[in-house]
Structures are given as structure tokens and as C-alpha cells.
Amino acid sequence: MKYTAILLAGSRPGRDEFAHQFGTDMKALVAVGGEPMVRRPVRTLLASPRIAKVIILSQAPDRIASVIPSDPRLCFRSSSATIAQTMLDLCDDPETSWPLLVTTADHALLDAAIIDEFVRGAARADIAIGVVEQGELLHRLPHSQRTWLKFRGGAYTGANLFALLSPRVRPAIELWRSVEQDRKKGWRMIYLLGPVALAGTLLKLFTLDELLARLGRKLGLRIWAVTLSNPLAGVDVDKPADHTLVESILQGRA
């Protein structure tokens, strides 16, 4: 089974200060390793035997296309106002080829082995979410600053990898859309699971897998996390410190 890769290369509303520090107004076009960062995950996806084609979504698809070498497996489309609405549009499009692997233009360290491990871990799920465990990442990169979600048994950061196996995932995306504009959307989603889930999360009574299982039962879906062995899967380029770190990794200095 081969996936259709969805690469999100959009921009935040308003001025992107990070991008402007590097001479552009789009984060996907910031140079990493001497080339626009979006090229790196695109090249990795096209080289993966797990991927049949790649759809790149952006508010300015022509600008993204202008920096990507042509390939018949590539398709460029305009994204909607939000990520959730963009994904709902894909769910409702009869031309969408399932399953989908969703990642982002700032995943500059994505490699074929990460994709392969994630896809194997996502088998038989309806939704799978790639994560990296805190201890593994900090062992590799002790000074890396990431956002950590803490649960009983461990803390995790996201790996910007999501597997959506069929249109059955639509209720989960609708739930995401309902909280997408909330700055504390993670807590809002947990609140929607009910007081037991909220209290359990606050007190760290649940593991990550247990909380995702609760969400899955609420939605009638099989949802789980795939903990990736390569800590670099948890590193994206979202701020100047990330850019410095990734450049150091690519140059073999970190």
C-alpha cells in the first residue's frame, strides 16, 4: 500500500517574522542547507518507496512550484484558510487517493527511514500521529528547545507526521476544526473528552496511548501514536534557534 503525501507549505496569517529574518515572506522558502527548505522534505518523499505521489498545499502554490524541480508525481494546489479546512476539503474530494501521509515544509531533516518506520507503525490505524520521546531527543540534542506534552510514563514532542488511512477520519478533523483557532487547542480537545480525561491529563494519570484511545472511542476510530526511534524526527525549523540547530546538524556539527 502506497500513500499520497500531503505536504503543507502554507503561511501563518499576517507577517511571518521568522521568514523575514531570512529575506522572504514565506517560511517554506527560507534557505536551509543552501536551498529553500521545502525542497528537502519534497525530495525525501519522492525518494521513498512508500509514497506514490506528493500534493503540495500552499496559499501561493505557484511560488512554491517555482523552487521545486518538476516531477510527474508532484501536484501543487491552493490551501484553504486553515489546515483543518484544507484537510476536510481533501476528505470531501472524490479524487483523493487514500491513505494520506501528512507532513510539513519545515520538516527539513525528514528521511526515508523515518517515513518507513512511521508507515509501519501506522498500519491498521485510522489515524496515526508521529512523536518523539523527550529522553531520546535530549540525549541526542541536549540543548534543543521543543514543546513537550507530558503524560504518565513520558513526555513527547510531535514529529509533524500524520497518517490518515481513509475518509472515516473526517469526524476527527471536524473536531480539530472546532478548536483550531484556540491558542490552547490541545487542552480544549482534552476538555471535549470529558471531565475524567481532563482531570486524568492534569494529574498525569493517563499515558499518551490511553488518552488517544479515549479519543478514538469517542470518535469511533483507531487512533494511536507512533514513537519514532530517530530523535531528529522531532526537529522542525520554526524559529531562528531551530534554523541554527538544523544547519549545524546538516554540517555534522551537532
Where do the PLM segments sit?
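Short internal beta-strands
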Residues: 39, 54-59
